[in-house]
Amino acid sequence: MNPFVSPCEFTRRDVLCVAAACAAGLLTGGPAQATEAPAFEIVDPPQVISWKPPLYHGWPTLARRKNGELLLVWSGGRESHVCPFGRVEFMISPDDGRTWSWPQVLLDGPIDDRDAGVVETADGSILVTTFTSLDYQPMLEQAEKLQPGQPGAWEPLRLREWQAVQRRISAEQRQAELGTWMTRSTDGGVTWSARYATPVNSPHGPIQLADGRLLYCGVELWKPEHRVGVCQSTDDGLTWDWLATMPIRPGDDSTEYHELHAVETASGKLVAHIRNHNPVNAQETLQTESTDGGKTWTTPHSIGVWGLPSHLLCLRDGRLLMSYGHRRPPRGNQVRVSSDAGQTWSEPILLTTDAYSGDMGYPSSVECEDGTLVTVWYERLKDSPLAQLRQTRWRLKG
């Protein structure tokens, strides 16, 4: 979840922003024409894979290890989209998502642990990322002003639980807990390091490059500069150095760039996607590219895709796959394919169109040995306010 953007709902303001974006596209020529979407088939229909439905699950990331295991991380143990109870959870599938292990809690600090990313490094280590947030505090402060029986007043137990969280540490200590974090396992996820700070955060975390480096495109959270850029690690994720600051499109505000993810193409070119909340191309995914290993990047530009945030994957045949949430009708999860290293993208493939609300998305995808694709996302279902993890298995036919 982007900590600077109110969650999920598509408002009248959004409609006006999208209309402005469309007008701007007509004036400037807009993105390249989309190509026809390849044929696909659903192998296994969407299903809930959460082990604990009475709790809220959000913002997952799926990755595949070299040994074929699937890794899934998310923010679990939650009461709602914004609350103080979030913790980073992790589970493994040995059979391409057909079965999953019982969740393991990796991080559970005194404030909210949110969106989780995961990657396996070239050395076989597993890196998991997250960020911490105090966005729940204004909600608690407002609730404490209301008397029982007043409109909007909380149930007494809920109020006591939130207040108990606040009493764990002081206000100064809570501020010190804000940060962007990583934890690391070198034994396949059995044991984990203490968390350590990273310069940036993005929901799906860093990527492994062919030259051995790890690349992390993201945003500096909780810092005045709020830089949008790229960090690299040359020691298996132990330490991170700032590599480049992303250029800003003329007229844009960099604080409206969020939730980046990148992929290395077969040629070595890097493609990164950005969640955009500027008035032009609002709620769209912007794209930027690098041909020098991430040292410099092109000015972000529209690719004509409404929906966010994007997760990128390079398929074995060299094509790129972007997966993203679509929070207006047809509400659900979509993917697009690029056969030319991101120069153009196909029309959308509609993986799901049955989402009950905008509290959903953040899909990520992996390619299995047999060529099938597994996509996992989070979604608030019709019969409960507690969002769950959902999964589908599918295949490109062309």
Per-region residue spans from a language model:
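N-terminal secretory signal peptides
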Residues: 1-10, 17-25
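Generic detector of low-complexity/intrinsically disordered segments
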Residues: 6, 18, 28-29, 211, ...
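Short, cationic motifs built from Arg/Lys/His that form the positively charged side of catalytic pockets
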Residues: 12-13, 92
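Positively charged, low-complexity intrinsically disordered regions
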Residues: 13-14, 115
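Bacterial Sec-dependent signal peptides at the C-terminal "C-region" and cleavage site
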Residues: 26-37
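Asp-box/BNR beta-propeller blade signature and adjacent active/binding-site loops
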Residues: 35-398
